[in-house]
A protein has these predicted regions:
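FAD-binding core/adjacent interface of flavoenzyme oxidoreductases
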Residues: 1-4, 72-160
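Beta1-alpha1 glycine-rich phosphate/pyrophosphate-binding loop at the start
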Residues: 2-72, 154-155, 160-161
């Protein structure tokens, strides 16, 4: 007796969602694993930082995206290990067998050997990062209104975007 092929997709970003959608109409069981329970639309994070959009406008629940697909299961777990020889994925809560594995975990920052920069910059890759930047900008603007030191005000109102 043959079973339906099991596909595990690690990552709920653009690549993971694209792969999962492509497999939604096939006779396979798809397990989408991501450490977040939502897809984050990163191209609009700058609008969260600017206060134009709310976080819920750029974070779409993964289960909602695939609610109509009977062959897709979404799990909010973090992958700890992959054993390719036994075709098994180990998460912080479970272990899963697979026939096919798609790794779509996205990208990371590159500070080009200058990792010390991390402590001095704001990044726009997460909701937390966007909200930290928004709060920093608001704090700087408010502080600039109450200072009488022109040089301090100039610093408070100076931002570099790279």
């Amino acid at each position: 007796m043959s079973h339906r092929k099991r596909v595990i997709i690690i990552g709920g970003g653009f690549g993971g969602i694209f792969a999962t959608r492509k497999l939604a109409n096939y006779d396979v069981d798809v397990l989408l694993i991501d450490k977040q329970n939502h897809h984050l639309f990163q191209p609009l994070l700058y609008q969260v930082a600017a206060g134009i959009l709310s976080p819920e406008n750029v974070a779409i629940p993964l289960r909602l995206v695939f609610a109509e697909s009977d062959n897709i299961t979404v799990r909010m777990e973090e992958v700890q290990n992959i054993d390719r020889s036994s075709q098994r994925v180990f998460t912080d809560y479970n272990e899963y067998d697979y026939d096919y594995l798609v790794i779509a975990t996205g990208s990371t920052y590159n500070f080009f050997g200058n990792d010390h920069w991390q402590k001095d910059v704001f990044t726009l890759k997460t909701l937390g990062g966007a909200l930290r930047l928004k709060n920093h900008i608001q704090t700087q603007l408010e502080s600039s209104l109450i200072t009488h030191d022109k040089e301090a005000r100039k610093k408070m109102l100076s931002f570099a975007i790279v």
